[in-house]
Regions:
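Short hydrophobic beta-strand segments
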Residues: 1, 79-81
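Contiguous, structured surface segment used for ligand recognition
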Residues: 1-72
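Aromatic-lined carbohydrate-binding surfaces of glycoside hydrolases
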Residues: 74, 81-168
């Protein structure tokens, strides 16, 4: 951990026998590792979704004296809403139901994101822990303010109208 760096930032330095990644925090390390994989191994942010082919290598030479310093983001919270998550939730990759979500969250991190709305309703709850475990901030869709369940799901027998049920 490098306390002199701003949040989410990293520095990569290479000398004769060491590749040193220092970061301000966990997300800084994640971004740094993904930058190493992009810059030196050619792994693109959308590698999974684009079926990027890979070849096995003996190793990779990184020039001595290489210094990579991340830049601060201009926007504090950067992310996306996994819309139509029901389509992802029915897709299994390598027999793992959560792998499409893991790959969506990894892509977000590779692009410099730090927050996600993993969907709405019951499906969203399934993937919040996965997103949080990957270091992402969880936020909510406008249909679920402060994480509240949608009215129609919570009260399926009532007409969803505030003027009739203000206490709900």
């Amino acid at each position: 951990i490098n306390d002199t760096l701003p949040a989410e930032q990293y520095t990569l330095t290479v000398d004769a026998d060491t590749l040193l990644l220092s970061a301000a925090d966990d997300l800084g390390f994640v971004y740094g590792l993904f930058e190493i994989s992009r810059r030196f191994l050619g792994v693109q942010p959308f590698w999974f979704w684009n079926d990027q082919p890979f070849t096995v290598r003996e190793g990779e030479k990184i020039p001595v004296g290489t210094v990579v310093e991340s830049k601060s983001y201009k926007v504090k919270y950067r992310g996306w809403f996994v819309n139509d998550e029901t389509l992802l939730s029915h897709w299994k990759v390598e027999r793992r139901a959560n792998l499409p979500f893991v790959m969506a969250f990894e892509t977000l991190l590779r692009l410099g994101g730090n927050m996600v709305i993993p969907g709405t309703g019951k499906n969203a709850v399934l993937y919040r822990r996965t997103a949080a475990d990957m270091g992402l901030i969880i936020t909510h869709h406008h249909a679920e303010p402060l994480g509240a369940e949608m009215f129609a799901q919570a009260y399926p027998d009532l007409e969803p109208m505030y003027s009739k049920y203000p206490e709900k």
